């Protein structure tokens, strides 16, 4: 909660005068830190306009169930929410959505994986190219 809140605080501090449209792409781990599901959302509520929930180390849990639970914590009626699997598609959707709203200054926050190159699914590491690689690919860099 604190790290997401701090991140959004910093976005508002740096870009606030530009009235940023903030999109948050996030999931959270399965089988542990259950309170993180609510905390991530709580840290962004009222300031993030679009939430995209996705896979992030679900382990033995269904990633869609985790995403639905996170989605249930979004109490801001003005916020858009969606669940997009797999994670690569969620990142691509967030960037496409930002491009569609090019009348605003957009900030897309993709949190959770960073440069990690695996997801834990059913107790096993499954290769993942990493958020930074996906973002650069989608942006055409």
Language-model segments: which ranges?
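ATP-dependent carboxylate-amine ligase
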Residues: 1-141
């Amino acid at each position: 909660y604190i790290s997401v809140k701090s991140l959004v605080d910093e976005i508002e501090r740096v870009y606030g005068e530009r009235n940023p449209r903030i999109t948050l792409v996030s999931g959270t781990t399965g089988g542990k830190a259950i309170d993180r599901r609510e905390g991530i959302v709580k840290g962004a509520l009222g300031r993030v306009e679009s939430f995209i929930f996705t896979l992030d180390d679900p382990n033995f849990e269904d990633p869609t169930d985790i995403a639905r639970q996170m989605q249930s914590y979004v109490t801001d009626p003005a916020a858009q929410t969606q669940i997009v699997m797999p994670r690569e598609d969620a990142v691509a959707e967030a960037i496409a959505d930002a491009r569609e709203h090019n009348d605003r200054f957009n900030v897309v926050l993709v949190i959770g994986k960073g440069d990690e190159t695996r997801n834990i699914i059913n107790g096993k590491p499954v290769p993942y190219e990493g958020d930074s690689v996906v973002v650069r690919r989608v942006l055409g860099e």
